[in-house]
């Protein structure tokens, strides 16, 4: 904290540091399609979202049965980067896998 002196009353006043609000968070949601193999979805969840085998399989099954599954919650820039990485990786391997971000 910084201090300033009020010369009229000889009182030291401390100013609190400015606090910034946390960034808005977004969930990255993987969408189901009829063409991407389940094993590929598990690999994507492990590679880009740091999921272990068990969590990746659980999310993949949620995507398969419910049509969508949350991969993680991130600040906007991180979420957008992960989505772009997944899209590029899937496209390069001839898979139509898609994910989107939604505000939390």
UniProtKB/Swiss-Prot annotation:
Gene3D superfamilies noted in UniProt: 3.30.1390.10
Pfam families in UniProt: ClpS
InterPro entries on file: ClpS (IPR022935), ClpS_core (IPR003769), Ribosomal_bL12_C/ClpS-like (IPR014719)
One GO term (biological process): proteolysis
Function: Involved in the modulation of the specificity of the ClpAP-mediated ATP-dependent protein degradation.
Record's subunit section: Binds to the N-terminal domain of the chaperone ClpA.
Family: Belongs to the ClpS family.
Protein name: ATP-dependent Clp protease adapter protein ClpS
Originating organism: Bordetella petrii (strain ATCC BAA-461 / DSM 12804 / CCUG 43448)
Taxonomic lineage of the native organism: Bacteria, Pseudomonadati, Pseudomonadota, Betaproteobacteria, Burkholderiales
Gene: clpS
């Amino acid at each position: 904290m910084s201090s300033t002196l009020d010369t009229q009353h000889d009182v030291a006043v401390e100013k609190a540091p400015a606090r910034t609000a946390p960034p808005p968070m977004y969930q990255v949601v993987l969408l189901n399609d009829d063409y991407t193999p389940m094993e590929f979805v598990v690999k994507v969840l492990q590679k880009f979202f740091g999921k272990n085998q068990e969590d990746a399989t659980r999310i993949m099954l949620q995507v398969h049965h419910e049509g969508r599954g949350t991969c993680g919650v991130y600040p906007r820039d991180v979420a957008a980067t992960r989505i772009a990485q997944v899209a590029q990786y899937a496209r390069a391997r001839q898979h139509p896998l898609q994910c989107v971000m939604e505000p939390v």
